Every structure is written in structure tokens, then in C-alpha cells.
């Protein structure tokens, strides 16, 4: 009798354990995604992720696989989202290629796929999700907004630089001005980053440099003379990534996530940061890289700004086994966001304001969070810590906090 009772207990435990650790597997090819050239996968991806999200359960692991291939995404039919992203231009709505939202215990495995984006898009977003892993894929754009050129001649006596435009750059000389063109966008570069042609290192003692994109003479297709461009540091063979200051979206965006792992992901280009994470807890980057495609990659650049950027995150931030190169700013940047006190309502209520045009609209703090006042001119602490009991938006860039 005792043996049978013990056997029944073991059987019930096994069944219960199995129910709590089941795994749901979803192959995205069954949802219409196709690695065929020029096929737009954006609408199929949006529909698939919405359907899969509805199947997420607390005690189930969801595994979403994308058969290895080259998948293209276009903005016209992509999911539209209003996202306010720290340290980026607040241009909305944004077109999102892979919108992961409200996911629980999910693993997305790209199985080595290349994700190619067109126009201006936010490639990957993960919002309001817990215990998720994104892995094994790369991100790139068909037509980057950065225009790469190579110095052919630098007349240091009379002035003027002649440069050659890289073969993949779409441009025109319009009224003697260089205009870069792409799918749904065009711009005139305002600055550049100079790289040594042979080493790909930054040219010594340079950061952002002025570029000569006006008063141009097109000597022949892709060979352009800029008579007014004077910079003795730019010797023949120097490669310059000419860019604007626009920063519409990162390659990967995390917001209000808990326990996120990004594994074996390569961001080859994004018009903003490679990764922007905000208001999230416990992030592990394992083999997450913002990098070129290898030693033979003709490009010298990757992202317009930081490789990785963490705004108002908490818990552990781990970055290992990654490579950050070719970006226009920091490899890793971790910070919070200050509000300026613009009005004292009463002894327990104030109005604070975001003071930077790339920092507003997103959540600043939640009820229960601690707040420390700081003297802006000296950075000295003022008084003891306080705790938020109520908060609401009072304007586009202002918050009323109690």
C-alpha cells in the first residue's frame, strides 16, 4: 500500500512539473516569412509576433525560430509605434521591423539570419517583457545614411580636397551641394569621422571634423573636388564617414523589461545607437556586437552614436564576449536622466522638466522610487532622499511629481 501511494505521489508531481515547464515552439516560416530577395517581411512578422504573444503563459517557455536566411523589412507596411527613446530624436510614429511586446519566457532564435532594413526603421524592440532571450541574428540597412568617401588628393598649398564616393552611396550634386539619398530620405552631411585607410583607426587627434560638401565640382562620376575644404590631417587614402546629426532610432530598443539576454547579435549599422535600453532591469549582453562584417568589409563605420546605451536601468548590466567598433561615440554608456525643478507647487509637490530635446516623453520614475535633489551648479546633494507617491505628465516635457 505504501509503495502504491508513493508511486501515485511521484506520478502527480511529474505531471504537475511537466505542466509548469512546457515549451511552445513556433517556426516563423509557417507565418509567411520568406528569405526571398525584395520580399517585405514586415507585415508577416508583426502579425506573427502578435499571435505568439497571446499564447505566452507564466509557466511556459516560448521558442520562436527564424530559419536561417536573409530577410528584408520595408517601412511602408511595418508596425507603427509611438516610442519615446532616450538620447534619440523624438520622431513618431516609428516603423518597427520586429516588435516584441508583452512577452514572457520567450526565446527568439534567428539561427544566424541576416535582417536587412530599408528606409528609416527601428529594427527590433522589446517592451514590457520578462525573462526573454534574443539571439543569433544580425541587423543591417540596405542604404545607410552615412556617406563614405576616400580622399584622393589634398592640395595643402592652394587648398581643396578631391574625394571619391563609395560605390554603394546614392547621391547627387544639387546646386553644387552634396545630397545623400535613400529610400524615403535625403540629407546633406554636416560632419564626419576620419579613419586611416590602412588601419581603420581614427585619424590621430580628430573627433568630429567639418566636411566640405558645398561649392563642389564633380570631376567625373563619384570623383568630386571640394575647393573650400581645407584640412591638412586628411592625407590621400583617408576614409571619411560623412553624416548628419539626426538620430531617429537605435538598432535594438529595450523598455520596461526584466531579465533580458541578447546573445550572438551583430549590429552592422543603425542610424542611432546600436542598443538603447531604458527603464529595464538585469540585462546580459553575451556576444552582442556592434561591428563590421569582417576584415573585408568595405565600410569603415557602424552606428551613428554609441554602441550600447543604458538609461535609467537597474540591477546587473553585463557585457561580455562582444566587439564594439566603427561607432561614432561610446562603446558603453550608463546614466540616468535629471529633471530640472521649474515650479514648486507646495511642500510635497513640484513640476520637473526634461531639458534636452532627445530626452522627454518616456517614463522618468514610478511610485515608490526614491528621488535625490541635487544642486545643479555644484552637483552637491540637497537634503535626504525622498520617495515618489504620485506622478503624472503635465506637458510634453514636464512632469508633476508628489
Protein language model features and the residues they cover:
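Extracellular/periplasmic carbohydrate-active domains that bind, remodel
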Residues: 19-402
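Bacterial Sec-dependent N-terminal signal peptides
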Residues: 1-24
Amino acid at each position: 500500500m505504501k509503495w502504491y501511494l508513493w508511486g501515485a505521489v511521484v506520478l502527480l508531481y511529474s505531471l504537475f512539473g511537466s505542466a509548469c515547464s512546457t515549451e511552445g515552439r513556433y517556426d516563423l516560416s509557417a507565418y509567411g516569412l520568406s528569405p526571398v530577395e525584395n520580399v517585405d517581411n514586415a507585415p508577416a512578422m508583426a502579425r506573427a509576433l502578435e499571435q505568439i504573444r497571446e499564447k505566452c503563459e507564466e509557466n511556459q517557455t516560448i521558442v520562436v525560430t527564424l530559419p536561417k536566411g536573409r530577410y528584408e523589412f520595408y517601412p511602408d507596411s511595418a508596425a507603427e509605434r509611438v516610442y519615446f527613446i532616450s538620447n534619440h530624436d523624438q520622431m513618431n510614429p516609428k516603423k518597427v521591423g520586429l516588435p516584441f511586446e508583452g512577452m514572457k519566457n520567450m526565446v527568439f532564435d534567428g539561427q544566424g539570419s541576416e535582417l536587412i532594413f530599408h528606409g528609416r526603421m527601428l529594427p527590433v524592440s522589446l517592451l514590457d517583457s520578462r525573462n526573454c532571450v534574443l539571439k543569433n541574428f544580425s541587423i543591417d540597412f540596405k542604404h545607410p545614411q552615412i556617406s563614405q568617401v576616400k580622399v584622393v588628393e589634398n592640395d595643402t598649398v592652394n587648398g581643396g580636397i578631391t574625394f571619391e564616393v563609395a560605390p554603394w552611396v546614392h547621391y547627387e550634386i544639387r546646386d553644387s551641394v552634396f545630397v545623400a539619398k535613400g529610400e524615403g530620405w535625403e540629407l546633406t552631411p554636416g560632419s564626419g569621422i576620419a579613419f586611416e585607410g590602412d588601419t581603420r583607426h581614427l585619424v590621430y587627434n580628430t573627433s568630429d571634423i567639418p566636411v566640405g560638401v558645398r561649392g563642389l565640382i564633380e570631376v567625373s562620376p563619384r570623383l568630386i573636388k571640394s575647393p573650400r575644404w581645407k584640412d591638412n590631417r586628411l592625407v590621400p587614402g583617408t576614409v571619411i564617414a560623412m553624416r548628419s546629426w539626426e538620430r531617429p532610432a537605435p538598432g535594438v530598443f529595450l523598455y520596461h523589461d526584466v531579465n533580458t539576454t541578447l546573445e550572438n547579435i551583430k549590429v552592422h549599422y543603425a542610424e542611432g545607437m546600436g542598443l538603447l535600453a531604458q527603464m529595464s532591469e538585469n540585462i546580459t549582453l553575451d556576444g552582442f556586437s556592434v561591428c563590421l562584417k569582417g576584415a573585408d568589409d568595405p565600410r569603415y563605420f557602424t552606428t551613428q552614436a554609441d554602441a550600447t546605451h543604458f538609461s535609467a536601468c537597474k540591477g546587473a548590466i553585463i557585457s561580455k564576449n562582444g566587439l564594439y567598433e566603427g561607432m561614432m561615440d561610446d562603446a558603453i554608456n550608463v546614466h540616468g536622466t535629471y529633471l530640472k525643478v521649474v515650479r514648486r507647487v507646495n511642500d510635497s509637490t513640484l513640476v520637473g522638466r526634461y531639458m534636452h530635446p532627445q530626452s522627454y516623453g518616456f517614463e522618468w520614475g514610478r511610485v515608490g522610487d526614491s528621488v535625490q535633489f541635487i544642486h545643479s551648479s555644484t552637483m552637491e546633494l540637497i537634503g535626504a532622499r525622498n520617495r515618489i507617491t504620485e506622478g503624472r505628465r503635465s506637458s510634453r516635457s514636464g512632469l508633476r511629481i508628489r
